[in-house]
Structure formats: structure tokens, C-alpha cells
Regions:
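Sec-dependent N-terminal signal peptides
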Residues: 4-15
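Buried hydrophobic residues that stabilize the cores of well-folded domains
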Residues: 21-205
Length: 205
């Protein structure tokens, strides 16, 4: 567990930064994402570690058939005991949600500041067009959204790989469509929901 300490210091430093440019924030988040990937590899390689969780859910809908969700969580030594006896709060630093429905697959990754639960970064890869980009048509969409340390929207990028293999950047169109306040509310509310599921499961083992 000692290897977590440098990582904790790294994350903590992320929360005390003053105002910064979008470029600086993007660079910072990319470093944090790389750190998270390293931590996840450690968690996966060590079967006795108790800081990861895998949840699967299936439900049938008449119109679209079977919907299949998988949610993975990775958290370090960040648990805090609540005033209620025996109730603990864990703050995952990373969550991955995979959604499969009607032969379409969407995978979304959430990078989370574990001390505060604030959203840092969202990456979505999907066979379906996000944010109503239906005019582009079929393709594989990769959406990235970056957030400041207080959880407010910073910037984003969107790339689509078309069936012929060509790529198209939709960065300007994406940032024109996204209203920062809506982005803040939608994504941060969903991350809080994911964390609540995680903590419910951890406290009901």
C-alpha cells in the first residue's frame, strides 16, 4: 500500500492549483490519466487488492432487446468513516462504464479527483453519434471532455472515424453545442450517482 502515498500527493496537488489556462489543464489531466492507468494495472495484477469493483447489469426492453451494462471502479486508500457507525465513504479515482444495446457499444471512462469526487475528465468511444451529430452519419466517435479542479467544464474534443477509414475533427462543433453549465450538471450528477452505487455496494458486502 505504500506506493499509494506518492499518488495521493499527486492528486492532492491537483486540487490546490489557482486559475489556469485550458491548455495547462488539459496537459495536467493527461498526466493524471496516465497515473490512473498505472494504478489500475497494479489493482488488476494483484488479486488480493480490495480497491477495485466490477458490476454487471442486464435488462430486457421490448423495442431494443437486451441492454447490458458493466461498471468498473478503481479506488485507492481514500476511505473515510462517516458519523454513522460502520458506514464508510470511498472515492474512486476511475470508473469505466460499458453499455451494449441493439448491437451498438458505448464505453465511457470517468477520471475523478478522489478527495473531492469532482469530475476531471470524460472519454467516450461509441458506435453511435453523441450530442445529436446525426448529420455526420455512421462511424466510431471518440469524445473527450476536460474539467477544471472545481468540476466546471474546461474544453473538449470530438473525432469520428468514418466507415472508409477517414477521420474528421468536430472540436469546434462540439464546443459550440456544449453549454458549460449543462455539461457541468449532467456529467457531475452522473459521477455522483456512480460513486453512490459504489459506496452502497462497499457498505453492503
Amino acid at each position: 500500500m505504500k506506493r499509494f502515498f506518492p499518488f495521493v500527493a499527486f492528486w492532492f496537488s491537483m486540487t490546490v492549483l489557482s486559475a489556469q489556462s485550458a491548455i495547462e489543464r488539459v496537459i495536467e489531466i493527461r498526466h493524471a490519466y496516465a497515473e490512473a492507468q498505472t494504478m489500475m494495472l497494479h489493482a488488476i495484477e494483484e488479486p488480493n487488492m480490495d480497491n477495485s469493483m466490477h458490476i454487471e447489469m442486464r435488462r430486457m426492453f421490448g423495442g431494443t432487446g437486451m441492454q447490458h451494462y458493466t461498471i468498473d471502479y478503481f479506488s485507492g486508500d481514500f476511505s473515510e468513516e462517516e458519523p454513522m457507525e460502520g458506514v464508510f465513504v470511498w472515492s474512486p479515482y476511475f470508473s469505466r462504464v460499458k453499455y451494449n444495446c441493439a448491437a451498438r457499444v458505448t464505453v465511457t471512462e470517468y477520471l475523478i479527483e478522489p478527495r473531492t469526487g469532482a469530475l476531471m475528465f470524460v472519454y467516450t468511444k461509441s458506435d453511435d453519434h453523441p450530442l445529436d451529430f446525426s448529420e455526420i452519419g455512421e462511424g466510431v466517435y471518440e469524445l473527450r471532455k476536460y474539467y477544471y479542479s472545481d468540476g466546471t467544464y474546461c474544453t473538449g474534443s470530438l473525432k469520428v472515424t468514418l466507415p472508409d477509414g477517414s477521420e474528421k475533427s468536430l472540436d469546434e462543433e462540439l464546443n459550440a453545442k456544449i453549454h458549460p453549465f449543462d455539461a457541468d450538471a449532467d456529467e457531475n450528477n452522473y459521477v455522483r450517482y456512480l460513486i453512490s452505487i459504489h459506496n452502497h455496494m462497499m457498505n453492503n458486502e
